Amino acid sequence: MSVSMDHRVLALAGVAQALQQVRRIAETGHSEAATVRTAMDSVFRVDAASPEAVYGSAAALAPGLRLLHNYFRNQGQDEVLPRLALAVLQLERRFVRDASTVATVASGIDAAARQAQQLGDSSHPDVLGSLGGLYAQTISHLRPKVMVQGNPHYLGQAGVVAEIRALLLAALRSAVLWRQMGGSLWDFLFAKRAMIEAVDRALR
């Protein structure tokens, strides 16, 4: 059993889970509160002792793990989601190499964490607005740009756009964790079986 691969698939599930909510809110205007809270909590837990601790528990990543399970078995129902995930994983490389942007984002996350503590809710609309604004001011200027498509009616609403951007920030945070755990795009070519086995272990 590869502990590092087990950790990598948890982080990858965090990416998939956050992006699934991006897709959902872009199409319907609504998201799943518990899943969004898990994503936002992960943004604030920058000094967590383990990947499980970043998300609260491995169980909190069950939706993302199921997405990975289906993807690896060619049973995914959303063809856009893998493309979004690839864009975020590529964006992570550009982000971590931009020290100025990393510092600005870290400072903004600290401020949003204090706001979340005062409000008692990491997914409060004001917190989502702060994190969404932070993403717009910093990460959205990096390339490749993550393009989100959906229902124009909802994508024209400021609250929806803020939540989407906050979730993209959460997805990027998980991508950074994935890379820190040794993740690489080469895994999808040369370690696919190990990834599948790790996902299956996590879902047991």
Swiss-Prot record:
GO terms for cellular component: cytoplasm; plasma membrane. Keywords: Cell inner membrane, Cell membrane, Cytoplasm, Membrane. The keyword Zinc does not apply. InterPro entries: HflD, HflD-like_sf. Signal peptide: none annotated. PANTHER family: HIGH FREQUENCY LYSOGENIZATION PROTEIN HFLD. Belongs to the HflD family. NCBIfam families: PRK00218.1-2, PRK00218.1-6. This is High frequency lysogenization protein HflD homolog. It comes from Xanthomonas axonopodis pv. citri (strain 306). The lineage of its organism: Bacteria, Pseudomonadati, Pseudomonadota, Gammaproteobacteria, Lysobacterales.
